[in-house]
Amino acid sequence: MYPRVTLTLPDWIHEEIPDPHRCYPTLEARMELAIRLAEHNIRAGGGPFGAAIFEIESGQLVAPGVNLVVPQHCSLAHAEAVAIAVAQQVCRTYDLSQDGLPPMELVTSAQPFIQCYGNLWWSGLHRLVVGARKEDVESLTGFDEGPLPDDWVARLTHRPPLPGIDVVSDVLRGEACRVLASYRALGGVLYSPGG
């Protein structure tokens, strides 16, 4: 018999998000949450990444996500993937662009790497908001983020017949980079294959 595969948000999420119905009116406020989640996740033994799904217009938080690769022994459990999975369960659909749902965005403390780029592609999200860049992640942590097309932003924004995904970069980039640097300084695990 094979084990049941379940990803569970850590209990401390409720400390960081005591009011799950709170609205975050600006991109900066939304990114501040993603960065706080990344910081707390490092202290809890996870990877240095945080993410959240929000309704674009209202700023209503739909779902948080943190990197659970090490604590939950699952290379799929990156912060963006966890946030998308939680949002899909909250909304009870695999398609976050389904009729009746407001347009949603993924706010992530760092640019999605190759795996999360694919997850984003199929999620139904309307916008991606990024803190640190790929080169920041690689230089500050030592992770290898894998290959992305040079024109990855253009491919997201224009992808017929699918609707485009808008991209906003460098939101609180300095603060996001500070979290990445702290992970390395604290001896954070490089959980890449063979790492």
List PLM regions with ranges.
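Zinc-dependent deaminase
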Residues: 1-40, 102, 119-195
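Short beta-strand scaffold segments in enzyme catalytic cores
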Residues: 49-55
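Short loop/turn motifs at secondary-structure junctions and domain boundaries
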Residues: 42-46
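Immediate flanking context of iron-sulfur cluster ligation sites
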Residues: 97-111
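Short hydrophobic alpha-helix segments
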Residues: 63-65
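Local cysteine-cluster metal-coordination motifs and their immediate loop/turn environment
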Residues: 73, 107-127
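A short, polar/charged loop-to-alpha-helix boundary motif
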Residues: 68-82
